[in-house]
A protein has these predicted regions:
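Short Gly/Pro-enriched turn/cap motifs at secondary-structure boundaries
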Residues: 9-13, 157-162
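Short, glycine/acidic-enriched loop or turn micro-motifs at the edges of active sites
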Residues: 35, 88, 165
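Metallo-beta-lactamase
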Residues: 55-77, 105-158
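Active-site neighborhood of phospho(di)ester-bond hydrolases with catalytic His/Asp-centered motifs
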Residues: 30-33, 79-85, 104-105, 157-161
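Residues that flank catalytic or metal-binding motifs in active/ligand-binding sites
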Residues: 14-18, 98, 131, 144, ...
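Short, solvent-exposed loop/turn and secondary-structure capping segments
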Residues: 41-42, 94-96, 114-115
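Active-site metal-binding motif and surrounding structural segment of the metallo-beta-lactamase
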Residues: 46-104
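Conserved beta-strand hairpin/beta-sheet module of binuclear metal-dependent hydrolase folds
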Residues: 2-66, 168
């Protein structure tokens, strides 16, 4: 995805929606996944009224799976999908990588199913409430500085603020 247009002022402005693919000797890792491909197909059907504030600008080919394939990644080889949090512009990769273990803070996962009124529009439940997802839950400070492969290359840090269970 290139960006999201927002109309909170008199002029639109763009917000980048990045996601990351890390090639690691122990297995590929995706961090976040950008927007779900469904917003490129029918953004109103997928996000509903949220598009009045956040207008996803995306072609179908911009989704994380197609982009990963475009650089030679076999999506079956993605070993982990790390979710910084489960907001709509980060959860597009959930369930798209068939063998991936999805790493998320337990606090974030639980909150995403029952957010407060202000945060609720940021969570699109159908993006992460899917069958057959292998979740690995981290437990905030108890698992802080979680070393994914035990080699110091990818370390997950509990960083609440933007969302209750945000991790970096």
């Amino acid at each position: 995805l290139k960006y999201i247009k927002m109309n909170q002022s008199n002029e639109d402005f763009e917000i980048p929606v990045p996601w990351f693919l890390i090639k690691h000797p122990e297995g590929d890792v995706v961090i976040d996944g950008g927007n779900a491909i469904e917003v490129a197909i029918d953004k109103h059907a997928h996000w509903g009224a949220v598009v009045n504030a956040y207008d996803p600008v995306m072609k179908k080919s911009d989704n994380c799976v197609e982009q990963a394939k475009s650089v030679g990644t076999n999506i079956s080889d993605v070993r982990y999908l790390i979710q910084s949090h489960l907001h709509l512009d980060h959860s597009g990769g959930v369930g798209r990588f068939p063998n991936a273990i999805h790493v998320v803070q337990r606090l974030e996962y639980d909150y995403a199913f029952n957010p407060d009124w202000f945060a609720a529009p940021a969570y699109i439940r159908k993006d992460f409430d899917k069958p057959n997802i292998h979740w690995k839950y981290l437990n905030d400070k108890k698992t802080d500085f979680f070393d994914l492969y035990g080699d110091g290359v990818i370390t997950i840090i509990f960083s609440p603020g933007h969302s209750p269970g945000h991790q970096s």
